[in-house]
């Protein structure tokens, strides 16, 4: 009997670095509302993602998906390029 994979996280973010071979750095932005004052607070985090064919470049809006650990810091892979940088 084949087991189904668990739900994998999918995130959207902008590529901020593509200097490495087959690796991109993606900046993810989370927005949350302050519980008391109601101000929208932005927080960002950077993750490294696997880009097999070196398709993505700086400024591209990409979709990344969680995957098994590929190296010491890589746990995401490029799913698709949503919008190219102008």
Swiss-Prot record:
The keyword Zinc-finger does not apply. Keywords: Ribonucleoprotein, Ribosomal protein, RNA-binding, rRNA-binding. GO terms for biological process: translation. InterPro entries: NA-bd_OB-fold, Ribosomal_uS17, Ribosomal_uS17_bact/chlr, Ribosomal_uS17_CS. GO terms for cellular component: cytosolic small ribosomal subunit. GO terms for molecular function: rRNA binding; structural constituent of ribosome. One of the primary rRNA binding proteins, it binds specifically to the 5'-end of 16S ribosomal RNA. Belongs to the universal ribosomal protein uS17 family. Part of the 30S ribosomal subunit. PANTHER family: 40S RIBOSOMAL PROTEIN S11 FAMILY MEMBER, SMALL RIBOSOMAL SUBUNIT PROTEIN US17M. This is Small ribosomal subunit protein uS17. The lineage of its organism: Bacteria, Bacillati, Actinomycetota, Actinomycetes, Bifidobacteriales.
